[in-house]
Amino acid sequence: MSVKLMMTWDIAPEREQDYFEFVIGEFIPGVQRLGFQPVEAWATIYGDYPQIQVGILAEDLPGVQQVLRSDGWIQMQDKLLALVKNFSYKVVPARNGFQF
């Protein structure tokens, strides 16, 4: 069964330019190389919710767990964590439409 890796975070103040360069230049291509398929990205413009939410599609739960333990993922996550705060993730069964 397909699953989604749902991630949320807030962009760290004063790091916006570095953040966007990293996401476009490294993060998106990196998750694709690891076998994930980015399917959605949302930005919160009002309210007390995470600023960014990203949904990444994966084939199955064991595959996600394996990638999340890989050196490639850990290195990318470390770079992301230097640019964001309040990072959180969960793996949920994939379905169409908005998931939170």
Where does each model-flagged region fall?
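Residue-level signal for secondary-structure boundary sites
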Residues: 15, 62-64, 97
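Short, solvent-exposed loop/turn elements at beta->coil junctions and helix N-caps
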Residues: 41-44
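Short, surface-exposed ligand-recognition loops at beta-strand->loop->(often short) alpha-helix junctions
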Residues: 10-22
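Short acidic/glycine-enriched loop/turn segments that link adjacent beta-strands
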Residues: 47-50
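An amphipathic, aromatic/His-enriched active-site/gating alpha helix that lines ligand/cofactor pockets
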Residues: 24-39, 57-92
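Short, low-order "capping/linker" segments at domain edges
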Residues: 92-100
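Charged, often glycine-rich, active-site loop that binds/positions anionic groups
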Residues: 53-55
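Active-site-flanking beta-strand signature of metal-NTP-handling nucleotidyl enzymes
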Residues: 3-10
